[in-house]
Swiss-Prot record:
SUPFAM superfamilies reported in the protein's UniProt record: YefM-like (SSF143120)
Entry keyword set: Plasmid
Listed name of the protein: Uncharacterized protein y4eA
Family according to the record: Belongs to the phD/YefM antitoxin family.
Residues spanning the membrane: none
Native source species: Sinorhizobium fredii (strain NBRC 101917 / NGR234)
Pfam families, sorted: PhdYeFM_antitox
Signal peptide: none
Classification via InterPro entries: Antitoxin_Phd/YefM (IPR006442), YefM-like_sf (IPR036165)
Amino acid sequence: MPRPGGSYSTSDLSRKSGDIIAEALRHPVTITQRNKPRLVLLNIDDYERLMRQYDARSVGTLETLPGELLNEFEAAVDAYGETDETNR
C-alpha cells in the first residue's frame, strides 16, 4: 500500500485510514485524487508550527526587522515626510 513519498489515493484513505493516519502522525502524507495531489495530512504539532511561522500578526521590533526591509521602511517614511511637507 505505501507509495514513495507517503502518497495515497482517496480510495486508499477509505480502505486503510488507520494506517495512513498512523503514518501522518510521523510525517506529512499526501492524498491524491485522480492522480493529482489534493490534500496533506500532518500531525497537529507540525500544523501549529507552520501556522505560527506564517502568522502575519507576529510581533517584531525594529531591531528584529531584516536590514533590507528596514531600508525599505525608512525610505517609505522619508518619502511620506517629503510629500507631507510639500503639501503644506
